[in-house]
Amino acid sequence: ARKRILKELKDKEFFVKKIENALSFREKIFANQENEIDFCRLIHSEGDGLPGLVIDRFKNIFSCQITTAGMEQFKSLIVEALKSVFNNDISIIFRNDLQIRKLEGLELYSENINFDNQNLITLQENGLNFLVDIKNSQKTGWFFDQRKNHYFVRSIANNLKVLDAFSYLGGFGFNALAGNAKEVTFVDISATAIDLISKTADSFYFDKKDKIKIINKKVFDLLEDEEFQKQSFDLVILDPPAFIKSKKDISSILKSYVIGCLLASIYCFTNGVLKYLE
C-alpha cells in the first residue's frame, strides 16, 4: 500500500483528483452564493488530503503555501495540476516565506508564475469588495477562514459604534459598515494594512467615509491611551495575529491575550459586545 501511495504521489493525476474533489465540495457549499467560489480557500492542507499545502483562490490567481519538505518536492506537479483543472493562463504565486519552513530545513522564498507586476487585486467576499496586495500581504493574502465571522459581524452591526482592532485589511470593519454600523474605527500597527484599508474605503465605501476612522498604531498602546479611553463602543472586535510561535512563548503571550481582553472590555458600553477571535 505504501509503494502504491508513493507511486500515485509522483503522478500529476493524484493532485488533479485532489483539487477537483476540493473544488466540487466548495461548489456545493457556495451553490447559492454568486462569485464566492471564485474567492475561497481551495486547498486546506490535510482537510483536503494534501498536508502541508494551502491554496487560496483569487479568481484566476492562485496563492500557494507549502510548509513541509514532503510537499515541497511535488511543487511542479501542483503547478501542472492547477493548470489542468483550470487553464494554462492562470497565475500562480508561491508564498513559501513562513518561518515554520525552517523547521523542515526548507529555504524561504516567493515565486511568481505567469503573474504580472500588479500587486493589488480586488477580492469579493460576502458580496463586498476589498483590495488585497496579493504578493505582500500576510500569509496567502486573505483569511478566508473568517468568512462566516465577517458576516456575523455584519448581521449584528446595525446602528452600532464599532472598534475593529488588529483590523488587517478590514474584513470585520467593512462588514460592519455593510450592516449599517453607526461608526467604525479601524486600528492596525501595519502601515501597509492601514493604507489598503484607506484605499478600499476610497474605492468601494466612499459614500460612508464619514462613518470611518482609521488609526495606524499598536493596538495595546492605543487601548492604554488616556485620550482614547474617553471613548466607548457597542462592539469591540479583537482579531490578533498568532503571538505564540513556540511553547516557550505561552506564559508571557497568554498574559498579553488576557490584558488585551481586559483593556478592550473597558471600551464596551453597558450591554456592549466584545468579540475575540484567535
Which functions belong to the PLM regions below?
Residues 1-59:
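Non-catalytic accessory regions of SAM-dependent methyltransferases
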Residues 11-18, 70, 74-78:
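Short amphipathic alpha-helical segments
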Residues 14-17, 21-33, 87-104, 154-181, ...:
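A short, charged
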Residues 36-38, 91-94, 212-213:
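A short coil-to-beta-strand element that immediately follows conserved catalytic motifs
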Residues 45-56, 72-142, 151:
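Non-catalytic substrate-recognition/targeting regions of SAM-dependent transferases
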Residues 59-72:
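A short interface-forming secondary-structure element
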Residues 113-278:
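Rossmann-like S-adenosyl-L-methionine
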